[in-house]
From Swiss-Prot:
Record-annotated site: Arginine finger: R683
Subcellular location(s) per record: Cell projection, Dendritic spine; Cell projection, Axon; Synapse
GO cellular component: axon; cytosol; dendritic spine; glutamatergic synapse; membrane; plasma membrane; postsynaptic density, intracellular component; Schaffer collateral - CA1 synapse
GO BP field: actin cytoskeleton organization; brain development; cell migration; establishment of localization in cell; inner ear morphogenesis; intracellular signal transduction; macrophage migration; modulation of chemical synaptic transmission
Subunit structure: Interacts with DLG4.
Entry domain remark: The central Dbl homology (DH) domain functions as a guanine nucleotide exchange factor (GEF) that modulates the GTPases CDC42, RHOA and RAC1. Promotes the conversion of CDC42, RHOA and RAC1 from the GDP-bound to the GTP-bound form. The C-terminus is a Rho-GAP domain which stimulates GTP hydrolysis by RAC1, RAC2 and CDC42. The protein has a unique structure having two opposing regulatory activities toward small GTP-binding proteins.
Name of this chain's protein: Active breakpoint cluster region-related protein
Pfam families per the UniProt record, alphabetical: C2 (PF00168), PH_19 (PF19057), RhoGAP (PF00620), RhoGEF (PF00621)
Modified residues (Phosphoserine): S57
Amino acid sequence: MEPLSHRGLPRLSWIDTLYSNFSYGAEDYDAEGHEEQKGPPEGSETMPYIDESPTMSPQLSARSQGGGESISPTPPEGLAPGVEAGKGLEMRKLVLSGFLASEEIYINQLEALLLPMKPLKATATTSQPVLTIQQIETIFYKIQDIYEIHKEFYDNLCPKVQQWDSQVTMGHLFQKLASQLGVYKAFVDNYKVALETAEKCSQSNNQFQKISEELKVKGPKDSKDSHTSVTMEALLYKPIDRVTRSTLVLHDLLKHTPVDHPDYPLLQDALRISQNFLSSINEDIDPRRTAVTTPKGETRQLVKDGFLVEMSESSRKLRHVFLFTDVLLCAKLKKTSAGKHQQYDCKWYIPLADLVFPSPEESEASPQVHPFPDHELEDMKVKISALKSEIQKEKANKGQSRAIERLKKKMFENEFLLLLNSPTIPFRIHNRNGKSYLFLLSSDYERSEWREAIQKLQKKDLQAFVLSSVELQVLTGSCFKLRTVHNIPVTSNKDDDESPGLYGFLHVIVHSAKGFKQSANLYCTLEVDSFGYFVSKAKTRVFRDTTEPKWDEEFEIELEGSQSLRILCYEKCYDKTKVNKDNNEIVDKIMGKGQIQLDPQTVESKNWHTDVIEMNGIKVEFSMKFTSRDMSLKRTPSKKQTGVFGVKISVVTKRERSKVPYIVRQCIEEVEKRGIEEVGIYRISGVATDIQALKAVFDANNKDILLMLSDMDINAIAGTLKLYFRELPEPLLTDRLYPAFMEGIALSDPAAKENCMMHLLRSLPDPNLITFLFLLEHLKRVAEKEPINKMSLHNLATVFGPTLLRPSEVESKAHLTSAADIWSHDVMAQVQVLLYYLQHPPISFAELKRNTLYFSTDV
């Protein structure tokens, strides 16, 4: 959950805050490419059960889904009598405990706000008043009443939660709290005037300014922090924030209260009162700011906003893009000095009436997008993982906060560079009266969302217009208040208590889809989030001319702190005139798309979990199973010594009377014959069912192997080769030599490093060494085709390094505890070891065995 920042709050009307039940203190960033990380704001409260995202606000929930209606006043269904009642009551206790903790924080905040009121009143009648009585009453209007209401509520609820049993009732307390919301109505009506008065008094009186800038808020009873400093402006916002939160808690309580429980009707009544209160407030004014209007005089609403990478003058810039009902505005956040309000600077805008999407033919004429070198992106990822590990170590050792902040700043800088340089999917828009613009996205899902949102608005009767400088200034100024996305999507912006995501391998079987109205050629792609952004990880085969495709294809997807899985369903385009030559320009039609959260408790079970995701009337059935990175380190020897998978390489070569296992030779031969120019060869996942079929054929030494290989998808063959090396009882470069490889690659002196690395190769058993050299030369030949297949030596080292070289189970348990640690400590070195040999001139088995110093260059 994103904490509420108390610094630099914008001057908002009370309705602004009701619409924006989330953080206003966004992290500052320089859209030209230089970010500055800031620490978490002081005085922010943590609520363990409430999501503060905009969608949790009654009004924002409806808006974020594109509808115009707020949440229905009908309360959520409670638990049926006797149905999981025990579990529901336990959840009810957890909800109440969380609410009680946040209520304590809220009361402490109200106390801090009231603390200066008495001395201010005392000086008001003296010859040198700080504030007048009228000013004091305006600023602190109804705060005392709100405090007393919540103190009484807290004092009555606390013992009930502390002495919990299944028969405890507290619905009457919430009913009474809801019945006193009239006090909040009076506070809300006065809120804008209170803020303006406080600001004017701060400007005219230094003494009051000092008081209002640092009010001391007591920490919770169990907190280590005795006090935190918060501004008066931030504390005056708290009652506004609390109104919507209390309503959300009632939803949660009803959800986990049996319908036959005595509290159920009381909670229903409290929810009805609360929702009617919110509705009455919302009806008092226009649901959007009247200051931002369209040329026709209608209210201009913000529909969507987010951070996108724009190609501007051949360089990448991070922009905050705002889609209003009639205009698309591209902005960057200005750098501001401490204490000043943040502002956006408009880079350009296009009225939606003038906005068009270029055709594939027009896009083809546009400049090609040159992707950032993959090896540099991989280096950034490894640095980020290493920094995460260092931060965790510092926290575990109770290190200095300054050291942690420095590490966080470094991590933010690397994450920002990764976010800026990784997107490659073009999103082109054109102003029919002039210039074209190009954004780069990492996800086709995201591109589709932007395109669909714009096209939906363009169906309305829109008029072209030109904004005056004043109108543009007003519109740009409104962006800060209206935005729904506050922080750049990097993991360093997450709170410590947020889930770090999953590390390991997600096995997904895409079974089938239903709901298509007419036959089409259909396929699915899978996307997962990694390092704060989404990337495409797998693609099913095309199922032709059908309304009910049955793929039943399995994929293994590596997760790196992932929290969500997206599935996109496409209709394949076979019209060559519509196919764009730009590899990143996907022109197939998206039929539907959907997203699910990767809940660790659901996916980490050993069994397959089957689910259905609905998208535009289409239902896609899939199953998934997760293997943690810790578990993936384990190598299981084959029980049958007649096969090749899971059998020692020396046993296989001796049985076959060959120097290199037959499976390695055949897979490499097939890849070089028809897959060496395949984009993403070895990086793109093959279909898991095809890989398992090939595994079974090789294990059985079936005579039809060659025929099957010639008919099989090349990515499945590449995947089979990777699987063979991964399932060896010990890695190809052996458990015994693993620590020595780690030490050798870390040497600084080139001569010492080469001597050590060649000595280590000599130390390998002959079957392992010969197979390694055979694979090495193959990977070099693949990399020679990098301009076509996009697979550099570094990419190949990233794919194969952790497979050929891994710590033994004993060693990984002895030194490392978490999946993230395993990644950051080992993978970088594993990749570097293989990359060293790939970049080395050809290595001769015969020369190695002469047992002499082996220098490739004068060092």
